[in-house]
Amino acid sequence: RPPGFTPF
């Protein structure tokens, strides 16, 4: 996270 980064 935030959405746009994976797997964060």
UniProtKB/Swiss-Prot annotation:
Record family assignment: Belongs to the bradykinin-related peptide family.
GO molecular function: toxin activity
Top-rank lineage group of the source organism: Eukaryota
Protein name as it appears in the record: Des-Arg9-[Thr6]-bradykinin
The UniProt record lists the keyword Magnesium: no
Tissue expression remark: Expressed by the skin glands.
Bridged cysteine pairs (disulfide): none
Record flagged with keyword Secreted: yes
Location of the protein in the cell: Secreted
Segments forming a coiled coil: none
Annotated keywords: Amphibian defense peptide, G-protein coupled receptor impairing toxin, Secreted, Toxin, Vasoactive, Vasodilator
GO CC annotation terms, alphabetical: extracellular region
Role according to the record: Produces in vitro relaxation of rat arterial smooth muscle and constriction of intestinal smooth muscle. May target bradykinin receptors (BDKRB).
GO biological process entries: defense response; vasodilation
